Amino acid sequence: MDFATNDEIKYAHDTLLKDYPDFDDEKQAIIRSNKSADIKACPGSGKTTTLLAKLVILANRMPLPANKGICVLTHTNVAIDEIKSKLSHQANVLFNYPNYFGTIQGFVDKYLTIPYFNSVSDVPIASIDSERASIIFENAFSKKGFEDLTCIWGQIKDRIPKTLTGKDKRNKVRREQIEFLFGSYYSADKNSFYREYGANRAIASDVGKPIFQLLDATRCQPLRSGVLKFEDAFSYGMAYINRCANLRDAFSERFSYLFIDEMQDTNELQYDLLEKIFDKDKVIIQRFGDPFQNIFEHGKMKWNPDSKAFPINFSNRFGESIASVLRTVCEKNNASLKGNVAIESHKPILLVFDNPLNVLPKFASLVSELKIGDKTILEIANEEKEKDGLHRNRIKAVGWVGKDKKDGLLRLTSYYPSYEAKPSNGVLYKHSLFEYIRKSPSYPTNWILRL
C-alpha cells in the first residue's frame, strides 16, 4: 500500500511549494514509498523538501496507531531549524511527544549516553564537548615527562621526518603524541583503546601495561570530570545498547518511522550504532543523502546505497554549465547528474594567483559584477536570502584547511589572516584540487582567471 494518496501529495505540495511546479515522478515515487529505502540525491535536488512532504502528510495523521512516533535525525541544528521554518504550524504537532526531531548526536546523548554514563560513572556528565575535553586532556598531558611518553614512541616514530632537528623536531613529536593519545578511540564497552573506531586490534587493553596507564591518565582524564568528547558519547551509547538488548525493542516499539537526512555525513560509528538501535523489521527506515558530498576521508563513509535506492538526479540548484563540470571532476562516477535547463548558471571560474591575499577581494568583485540575465550574482543571492525563512547568506568562501600546521602549505589564514580555526574531529580528503580538475576530459582553460 502506498504511503500517500494523490490528494495528500497535492496537499503537501501546496503547503510547501504552492507557487512552484508539482513534484516530478522521481519525488512522487519517494513520497509514495512505504518501505525501508535509501534515497540517493544530487545537490539541490529537493531531497529535504521531499522528506518534508512526507512529514506534512504524517502530521495530518497524528496520533499514529498505538500512539507511535516519528523519529527524524540529521547532523546539524541548522537543518532542524530549516525543517521547523518550512513546516510552519505542522511543526507544533511533529516536534512533540511521541516524536523526536533532532541531531543524531542529540538523540544518542539523550537516550543512551547520559543515562548510561551517569549509571556507571562516579561523577555525572557535566558536558559533551570535544573542545572542553581537549583542555582537560592537555592539562593532564603537560604533566607527563619524557619517561612516561617513551611507551608510545614506536607508534609515532614513522610520522617524524628524519630531516627534522631541534625545536622543529620537538614540536612535531609533541603534536604527534597529542594526536595519538587524544585522537585514540576509547571503547567504553571493552575498556580498551584503539587507534580509531573499527580498528581490528587494540593499541592498549592490558591495564598493567605502561601504554594503557598513559592513555588512562591522559585520554580518559576528561571522563573523570564528566566531560566527554563527541565520539565518547557514541562509545558509551554503544556500550549501553550492547549490554541492554531490550533497548532495541523499546526504540522499535516507540517509533513507526525513522527518517535520516544527510546520511552521507554519518560516520562509521554513528552508522553502526543506528543499526543496533532500530530494527528494520519493525521500523520503516528511509535514509536521504548524496554519497558524492560526504565529508569523510576516502573509504570512511559506510553508507552505500545499492541499485535499489530511489534516485533524484535532477538538480534545481544549477544549470547544465555547472552540472557538466561536476560530472567530470567528481571522484566517483556521477554521470547521471542533470542540471536544470531552465536555470541559467554562470560557467565556473578558476582563480590562479601568486598572492593569496588577492583571492577574496577578487571573489567579492566577481559576485558583485558578474550577471546572470539582468541581475548580478549578489542581487540574486540577496533575493534568495529574503525568501529563506532563516535568512541565510548564500554566498560563501570555503577553505580546505583551517589550522596552521607550520608546514608551508596554504590554508584559510593564507587568504584571510584574521581567521581563527575551531577544533574539529572531521578528516578531510588529502588529494589536491588539481587532482580533481585533472580528471576532466578536456583541460578547463576557459575556467581559469589569473590574478
Identify the meaning behind each predicted range.
Residues 422-451:
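Long, charge-rich alpha-helical interaction segments
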Residues 68-69, 81-180:
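Conserved P-loop NTPase-based nucleic-acid remodeling module centered on helicase motor cores
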Residues 176-228:
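Conserved helicase NTPase catalytic core signature
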Residues 55, 74-77, 104-105, 288-292, ...:
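A short beta-strand-to-loop transition that corresponds to the Sensor-1 phosphate-sensing loop
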Residues 313-424:
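Helicase P-loop NTPase motor core
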Residues 1-119, 249:
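P-loop NTPase Walker
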Residues 272-344:
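Conserved RecA-like helicase ATPase core segment
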Residues 4, 8-46, 206-300, 314:
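Conserved helicase NTPase motor core
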